[in-house]
UniProtKB/Swiss-Prot annotation:
Protein name (Swiss-Prot/TrEMBL): Ribonuclease HII
EC number(s) per entry: 3.1.26.4
Cofactor note (record): Manganese or magnesium. Binds 1 divalent metal ion per monomer in the absence of substrate. May bind a second metal ion after substrate binding.
A GO BP entry: DNA replication, removal of RNA primer
Keyword Cytoplasm: yes
Species of origin: Chelativorans sp. (strain BNC1)
Primary enzyme class: hydrolase
Gene3D superfamilies, sorted: Ribonuclease H-like superfamily/Ribonuclease H
Classification via InterPro entries: RNase_HII (IPR022898), RNase_HII/HIII (IPR001352), RNase_HII/HIII_dom (IPR024567), RNaseH-like_sf (IPR012337), RNaseH_sf (IPR036397)
Amino acid sequence: MASSQSDSPPLFDLPVRPDFTIEWKIMREGLAPVAGLDEAGRGPLAGPVVAAAVVLDPDRIPEGLDDSKRLTAEARERLVQEIFEVAAAVSVASLCAASIDESNILKASLEAMRRALDGLCVRPAYALADGRDIPPGLPCPCRAVVKGDQRSQSIAAASMVAKVVRDRMMVRTGTLMPHYGFHSHVGYATERHREAITAYGPVTRLHRMSFSPFKTSGEEDRILASGDAAELIASAFSAADGLNGRDAEKEPV
């Protein structure tokens, strides 16, 4: 099994913006290329968790890479398009609400990261994963980097790709279920989303029934997604699976 380690430097050491310092240190030890791993969608009540793996070209790093949460939606879209165009490799993977319910959100997030790394069209010699936990079963050594999307440009790029892809998936799903408002909250527990759940009930294959308020409310009824709605949910949630860098350059999702 590949060796792994957890990296938790002091928070006051955070750079103004993520840079390539960690990657260069690893590459100088003869471990190249380096992949960044991150996920989006751990907190929402609905939808998949999406992970991305990105191998940046050190000579073509997009300007303005940052923690995706610090950027506007327009800035994220622009940067993600550039990442798909200039990165050495990009891969995206997702796990649906049912998979999250079967295990838990942490295990599902780590599994999505593992699948994203496996989907890269190049074999990384090392990986950097955002957070405190390392995905099990990786084919290369990995370091967990706390606040990694604020420290490492590779992780920041993966964070942005995962966020944009997941948002697009939820917006596409919401086109057939406009009363839930997925186009605006993309599954998070906003007041509008909670009101829609109260009014219409949770949606099978979409809402995470192991999450509050479902687990604590004793809610048994679900809307069964059928016909076009079921097909859209299935296609939207699988749209990112198996995406690799060369395919992604033309159309991110």
